[in-house]
Amino acid sequence: MPMYRSRTSTHGRNMAGARGLWRATGMTDGDFGKPIIAIVNSFTQFVPGHVHLKDLGQMVAREVEAAGGVAKEFNTIAVDDGIAMGHDGMLYSLPSREVIADSVEYMVNAHCADAMVCISNCDKITPGMLMAAMRLNIPAIFVSGGPMEAGKIDIADLEMTKIDLVDAMVAAANDKFTDEQVQHIEENACPTCGSCSGMFTANSMNCLAEALGLALPGNGSTLATHSDRKALFLEAGRRIVEITKRHYEGEEKGLLPREIATFEAFENAMSLDIAMGGSTNTVLHLLAIAHEGEVDFTMTDMDRLSRKVPCLCKVAPNTANVHMEDVHRAGGIFSILGELSRAGLLHDDCGTVHSASMGEAIAKWDIKVANNPEAESLFKAAPGGVRTTQAFSQSNRYKDLDTDREGGVIRSKEHAFSQDGGLAVLFGNIAEDGCIVKTAGVDASILQFTGTAHVCESQDDAVNNILTGKVKEGDVVVIRYEGPRGGPGMQEMLYPTSYLKSKGLGKACALLTDGRFSGGTSGLSIGHVSPEAAEGGTIGLVEDGDRIEIDIPNRRIHLAVSDEVLAARRAAQEAKGWHPAKPRKRKVSTALKAYAKLTTSAAKGAVRQV
């Protein structure tokens, strides 16, 4: 029988001092034999997706202790990408993922915890904790804070009734809106606690946690404000004790993160991502999580899946007026997984923390096939329509569910939005190791696009050039030296893409970068160009006026410059060093320098190489 890890610090004469300290935390003799469950929280008042998590850790802890475990809570950091956006704060976002993973490892291993419940929500917190779970490989269950309700608005010139923070950004840069209208949009864009309401990075990752098998059904789509979400937290507390005892005392196999999140589970997660048009950031994170679990899942696998998995669901920012609350009404993630399964595009035999197999879970939770009142009730959980920062503050329910798979929010393969999926990997001489585009957000008219390079040596330059009218129709805005090393930190480019839309160039220009994009990005926005400029990538050799050819259907991107000219440019660049031609006013701290020194390319998930 595997010995509880916690016995290292709770048993033996030599641990008298440690037990004395444990007693000072409230433990008694009867606790020194129970599994110690780490409650890994991420509460912060800086982030709306985490502002409501303060008391939820202790709520889970009470369930853990009632089920026979000992609960010990600690907190990680959490960066709000939306607040950090558009200034040097964004340099810290991606590196914070590694800090989160490390901090979880440090706390869990230093105190010999046996298992953990991870309470995450926003962009880098869920992937950071998933990386830690794969690294530690102890029983773990993920339960996120949930999505916020969509903003509701009625402005004549705005072609939508549901909005989010991206709409506020676009409106603010669009001169057709008055200051009063912009303020009205701003005030209504983010009405409640929770992760931003569209299929941005946070919600994408929380949905993928379901597909990986490490989160409970409803984790990705049940609103933060709805009382039904409370049940997920309570169930996580009870179930973690159950699977911990089954692993350590019953010697049962298939309960650890690496046994659940196998190569096939990563294929399931990526297939879901492609089917729902998730954030391109998920590519980075899935690669990093797989790396931590020693799962050989690569960009090549993603490319293979992207060629056969259809787009079954379009959510903001890929379409207007459809948000996570609408996905939930249509049956949530298990309804998308069910459609993938029926299309032969899912590994049904993968395990989960809640069911013996993914197929068994689909049979119970997919509203199209399940005769399950519990599932029907869960997916009728509706928004409350009241501004609040309180979790579980309302119990509204839809009168009916969206089960229309021909024209509804979730489609069957036969009625897919496109038979080509929502994410694609492109390769070419400007991106030998690949780059990523969210095809679900690209208008069909520009899936094939040839344009003229407009080179910017930083995101700041790009923003200035777009807002001052220097970027013209037909341009490919190239933003370089913003990769993991070059930034450092691989900034998100939400402002440039939003400003292109506000200037009416969303369908007339492309954007190409070795940086990355917010989950709120749409349009012909191609990121993660690898190798990055700072590593000697060809993107560093592009000059103003060069022709760039983008062919998404054929997964190709090409810089139309001869090999001889590129060789001459490379020799000249190597002579002066791979750095921006125009000096940047950017203070790089010691922490960021350390990150830049160790990080790898986006094609490898921007993980550290040590």
From Swiss-Prot:
Residues annotated for Mg(2+) binding in this entry: D81, D123, K124, E492
An annotated GO BP: L-valine biosynthetic process
GO molecular function, one term: dihydroxy-acid dehydratase activity
InterPro entries per the UniProt record, alphabetical: Dihydro-acid_dehy_C, DihydroxyA_deHydtase, DiOHA_6PGluconate_deHydtase_CS, ILV_EDD_C, ILV_EDD_N, IlvD/EDD_N
Reaction catalyzed: (2R)-2,3-dihydroxy-3-methylbutanoate = 3-methyl-2-oxobutanoate + H2O; (2R,3R)-2,3-dihydroxy-3-methylpentanoate = (S)-3-methyl-2-oxopentanoate + H2O
Gene3D superfamilies: IlvD/EDD C-terminal domain-like
Superkingdom of the organism of origin: Bacteria
Chain positions with N6-carboxylysine modification: K124
SUPFAM superfamilies linked: IlvD/EDD N-terminal domain-like (SSF143975), LeuD/IlvD-like (SSF52016)
Family that this chain belongs to: Belongs to the IlvD/Edd family.
Protein name: Dihydroxy-acid dehydratase
Lineage, broadest ranks: Bacteria, Pseudomonadati, Pseudomonadota, Alphaproteobacteria, Rhodobacterales
